[in-house]
A protein has these predicted regions:
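Bacterial Sec-dependent signal peptides at the C-terminal "C-region" and cleavage site
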Residues: 5-25
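Cell-envelope and extracellular/periplasmic
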Residues: 20-320
Length: 320
């Protein structure tokens, strides 16, 4: 496997998703998806128990039935979940490594035999796959309940480097080392790290120092990720901590402001896109997990729209 550090540059024609090919369609473009439980994915697909899943309100099957045109690309003519042949996902969860073509189920609860949730990766992958002429690999590196302040703490922030910052890069390295085995169709191709998508923030709300340092720590994270992969202009997308929509407490508003401010910090030199997600929150009454506000109440529409926006934000950067 050949590791390529150059960033591919694309032109996307106005009004369509056709992109100029990269230097070679043999190159696998790799996007790192990082964060905590909402990047793991909590959107319910099909579970509809009247007590535990609110009768299926807000699950993927329900929202697809209400708006079939918007979601029609997710299933084939026979009603089976589509599996893309040009976009791939690799995610290690507690059950082990999941690796395969983009479809539902690459989440913290998922396995090859159990696919009942989605995360942002689903529509991120569709956005990138539709825009890029060549194979795409999404490497998910997400763990629930982790803070940027401690767990993902990057080296340039000072102090002890976070365990999950180190594990994030270890997962990427392992994925690239094993790409020929885990994705035989990609065997022998060169790969390049083409973008970084960050969707996190919940745990940093509950520590005064974490709140105050979030903006700076996020800037350090972006700089250090770019340094790790020798790409000072690596495209980066920051997903807003948008749980609950516009109505939010002081601490959540502080994290949101820090995320937005970090995206425009001069030392990053641009090529960072902040994506607001508050508009994608849905009421608990219309969602499967009425007691899980920290997980967007498990609403599949929320996770679909978040992924759509994050993926679209990355495509915007790739146009430059």
């Amino acid at each position: 496997m050949i590791f390529v550090v150059a960033i591919a540059v694309f032109f996307i024609a106005t009004g369509c998703c056709t992109a100029l090919p990269p230097k070679s369609t043999d190159i696998v473009q790799v996007y790192i998806l990082a964060g905590q439980s909402n990047m793991e994915g909590q959107g319910v697909v099909d579970m509809d128990h009247p007590k535990y899943y609110n009768g299926g309100k807000g699950n993927l099957n329900t929202v697809m039935a209400a708006d079939p045109d918007h979601y029609k690309h997710l299933k084939d003519a026979k009603g089976n979940w589509r599996v893309r042949e040009d976009v791939f996902v690799r995610f290690r969860n507690k059950q082990g490594v999941m690796a395969g073509g983009l479809t539902i189920g690459f989440t913290g609860y998922g396995s090859d035999r159990s696919r009942h949730h989605i995360g942002p990766e689903l529509q991120i992958g569709h956005q990138l796959g539709d825009a890029i002429d060549g194979p795409v690999l999404l490497i998910k590196t997400a763990w629930g309940g982790k803070s940027l302040y401690k767990d993902f703490r990057p080296p340039s922030a000072g102090g002890q480097v976070g365990e999950y910052y180190t594990r994030m890069h270890a997962e990427v390295k392992q994925a690239l080392d094993n790409i020929d085995r885990e994705f035989p169709v990609l065997a022998g191709r060169s790969v390049e790290i083409s973008g970084f998508i960050w969707f996190q923030g919940w745990n940093d709300m509950f520590n005064k120092d974490a709140l105050e340092q979030y903006e700076d720590n996020l800037v350090h994270l972006i700089k250090d990720v770019r340094k790790e992969y020798k790409q000072p202009k690596l495209p980066v997308v920051i997903g807003e901590l948008g749980n609950g929509g516009l109505k939010a407490g002081k601490n959540m508003l502080s994290i949101r402001a820090a995320q937005k401010a970090a995206a425009t910090r001069k030392e990053l030199g641009g090529n960072v896109n902040f994506i607001s997600t508050t508009a994608f929150a849905r009421p608990k009454e219309h969602s499967p997990n009425v007691g899980h506000g920290h997980h967007w109440f498990g609403n599949a529409e929320s996770y679909f729209l978040i992924g759509d926006a994050l993926g679209g934000g990355m495509v915007e950067l790739l146009k430059k």
